[in-house]
């Protein structure tokens, strides 16, 4: 009898230890981080299940298709020198980019030139050793200050103009608030060189890239249009309770259940986002994620009566960001075959999507004309002119106080707790390249 009992215990222990290999790893979010984590896991022979609330993959990489071309609502640019992992994804997808070369302003380039060299030297010798994902090597005090403070301390006079251009229109906030750590991660000497008009970058349809790449790269199920009603981590294994829409967008009456060996949360882990998934947070998770900041960032595709290949930016002193009211800060008609402009707006924590949309229409109505003819009155922009408008929970980051308080060390200690892992722009920076790296690194480090 004793021998029989021991045999049962042995079998149970064997089954328990085998569960992580039998059960799938559940990934919440089918953006660049979640998709590349899934690919890396499948390469290791692990099963995956992906949950995505949108009806298509790509995360923030969405687009509107009209006039026989794409109009990006998310990421649109990449650089061969600074985006090595992105290049691999693009190659697999079979898509190609179009070079966007800026108009070179020789006077400004000369002004920036000597400061650029100092910046590149600092980036290589001081910042690069601390640039690892999840900032595992620590964050020196000098990298926790705001971007404005860092620029002033290093006596940069021309670079603030480039930083404003690189930050505001692309959703990265106010240099007077955002720590320099993140801007150095973003603005490699190569990327800063683009904003200094030294060279061009590549423009590509990232939504198509991810759709095509996913078809070729991932074999596990992807539950698009799914609503997670609870992520239960109270037991030994995480359980995701969800409702998955059918092909007509109808959700089932009864929720479905997926038991997971682990969960990778591939979205910005803000407290509201975690609470929306009904995650019961631990005290440590509440401490780490409560001060997490986002930039309220909106993107649109609007049909306008402006000349082709024309851009507008909100007026402000060149080294001072425009106010974050929710109004558009920049627009650009990317193709001379279309009169659809891509727009970018940024707001504050009280800016709602309806408010930002109304500000978009009001602002663009004033400039919806040919600016070369001062007698022409702007044509009102109405709902049918707006082909797409997207609100983005953008650029998750910690503030100077948290960075100085060792918040990334606290964040890294959460990885794996309750079989939960985090992969998003918070791990490095909010770009396609760093999202890809975040997904890969989490798998390489913990699986």
Where do the PLM segments sit?
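Fungal secretory targeting signals
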Residues: 1-20
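N-terminal Rossmann-like FAD-binding beta1-loop-alpha1 element of flavoenzymes
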Residues: 22-50
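Glycine-rich FAD pyrophosphate-binding loop
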Residues: 42-65
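N-terminal glycine-rich dinucleotide-binding loop that anchors FAD/FMN and/or NAD(P) in oxidoreductases
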Residues: 63-86
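Mobile amphipathic helical/loop "lid" adjacent to a hydrophobic cofactor/ligand pocket
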Residues: 87-178
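Helical element adjacent to the flavin cofactor pocket in flavoenzyme catalytic cores
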Residues: 187-262
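C-terminal segments that line or cap access tunnels to active or ligand-binding sites in enzymes
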Residues: 261-262, 271-421, 429-433, 437
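Internal hydrophobic alpha-helix adjacent to the cofactor/substrate pocket in enzyme cavities
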Residues: 435-447
